[in-house]
Amino acid sequence: MKTIRQVSVHGGHSKEYCLHAEDLLEDIIKKYIQEGFAWVGITEHCPPLNDDLRYPDEIKAGISKKYIEKRFKKYICQVNEFKKKYSSEIKIFLGFETESYDGYIDYTKELIKTHKPDYIVGSVHHINNICFDFSRQLYGKAIKSSGDINQMYEDYFDKQYELITSLQPAVIGHFDLIRIFDTEYIKRIEKRDIRKKIVRNLKACKKNNLILDFNTRALKKKAKEPYISRSILRKAKELGVRVAPGDDSHGIMDIGTDIKTGVKILTRAGFNTDWPVPDIYTCPAQ
């Protein structure tokens, strides 16, 4: 029987660099090694563009953009150190996770130019500059900003398409995160206008040879299935889009648990379990 390598294309959030995470980054890496992972992408959130666009927990804690930038520089240095320190035990990729608020394209290119990651995870957490996935309250606020929930889905996938085509990130994070607080998402993603945008985005991922993060953190949050939803996953398989597991770990307890369920789902869906390794990000910063 074939042994399937454990990998995570999106993970490694730690309390040193993310207020809503737990545990030290080095302990998290040691846990990946203990669990037998072949490789992992350490992909912390990038700093905010300005103080107004900090995460709600960062605003509450009173930490500034300047502080977060300084902390991010330390993160980059530390991951590069750990890449060397643990090179005989695990392959570590240095990455970071993008945002999607106004001005993010040029800002992300500048971050890439400055910090030289191995790759980035392109994620959409904001609709109309509202961090919709942080709480039900903010999700509701994002719906109002779009007009209704169906339009919010369309706005989300339009923003994701913009991200895909402008930055070509090696990995697309939690493709359908927009469903996070929507109990009717299974029906909603089949609506014609929304579905057209989903398929358009999948085709763009295929064209640019991007990898979809099969994000199992959704299971930890008691969702019915990982991001990507089953019907979208089937379409990705049909189109030949590359997919790899991502635990989106925010602490030691997230490592080596739900990702096994994700691997089983991908195996049953017929995906190649010789997991694709992300291409090093090559989009020029202009």
Regions found by a protein language model. Give the residues of each.
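Conserved, mostly hydrophobic/aromatic
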Residues: 32, 120, 174, 212, ...
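Mid-to-C-terminal alpha-helical segments outside catalytic/metal-binding sites
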Residues: 254-286
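Non-catalytic positions within long, well-ordered alpha-helices that form the structural scaffold/packing
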Residues: 33, 113, 164-165, 237, ...
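Extended substrate/RNA-proximal surfaces in nucleic-acid metabolism proteins
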Residues: 54, 61-205
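Hydrophobic residues within beta-strands of alpha/beta enzymes
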Residues: 40-42, 120, 172, 212, ...
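Charged helix-capping and loop-helix junction motifs
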Residues: 22-25, 189-198, 225-234, 260-261
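Extended hydrophobic/aromatic segments used for targeting, binding, or gating
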Residues: 214, 222-245, 257-260
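An N-terminally biased module of ancient metal coordination in phosphate/nucleic-acid-related enzymes
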Residues: 1-102, 106-107, 181-182, 188-192, ...
